[in-house]
Amino acid sequence: YPDYLDKRLATTRRTMQCIKRDVRPGGSSFSHLVGNGIEMYSRANYLEIEKPHRIVYTQEFCDKDEKISRHPLAPTWPERMLTEVTLSPEGTEQTRVTIKWECHGDTKPEELAAFVKARGGMTQGWTGSFDKLEEYLAETP
């Protein structure tokens, strides 16, 4: 299961290794991402989980010791993001995935501007992850 997530959740042209995973309200995960000559760490703090329909978590970049840091290529990137993933049935064979991703906490104007400017890249990242998931599901009986 962890290997599956590592391979499917990493964005295109990146690899991910989950160092720690405790997916439950109040739990957290800590991951190492490498790709395109960049190495970074991130942490997710799980706030709400409604199986199998919804998960809400905050996300932040960290150093290897889990101390909050900034995105290595975007020093004005918001310190913390709030992510909500909702799964809704679409007929009997499909599921609609809705992602709501926003700045969380005390966000400075320049951080919000960096977030808005990067929207296209974020869409590409989420799409790459879902493309990997779709490939996996097509291979699975």
What residues fall within each predicted segment?
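Structural motif
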Residues: 4, 27-28, 52-54, 84, ...
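Glycine-rich portal/gate segments that line the openings of hydrophobic small-molecule binding cavities
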Residues: 16-70
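Short, flexible helix/strand-to-coil boundary loops that buttress conserved ligand/catalytic motifs
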Residues: 8-9, 59-61, 130, 137
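Short, highly charged C-terminal tails/helix-capping segments
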Residues: 18, 134-141
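Short solvent-exposed loop/turn micro-motifs enriched in small/polar/acidic residues
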Residues: 13-14, 39, 78-80
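Hydrophobic ligand-binding cavity/cleft-lining segments
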Residues: 1-16, 132
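Beta-strand/loop substructures that line and gate deep hydrophobic ligand-binding cavities in soluble
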Residues: 67-124
